[in-house]
Regions:
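Basic nucleic-acid-binding interfaces
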Residues: 1-23, 27, 31-66
């Protein structure tokens, strides 16, 4: 099973053109893309790991593979 840090996921999203749309006082961040439909929601601290269904959900929302 692949394990990846939240910070690495965010770096990959930004490199692909996604930008931070919402980040309030919660641990959830929402990213939007200028041409792709939908939003990508990422929860957790930057140092947290993501794997399994959470990573699959982020891949589905963004169209990226990690």
């Amino acid at each position: 099973m692949k394990v990846i840090k939240v910070s690495a996921i965010i770096d990959a999203l930004i490199k692909d053109g996604w930008y931070l749309d919402k980040h309030e006082s919660t641990s959830h961040r929402q990213f939007k893309h200028p041409t792709k439909k939908g939003k990508v929601t990422i929860n957790g601290k930057l140092s947290d790991d993501r794997s399994g269904f959470l990573l699959k959900s982020i891949e589905r929302q963004s169209g990226l593979k990690f």
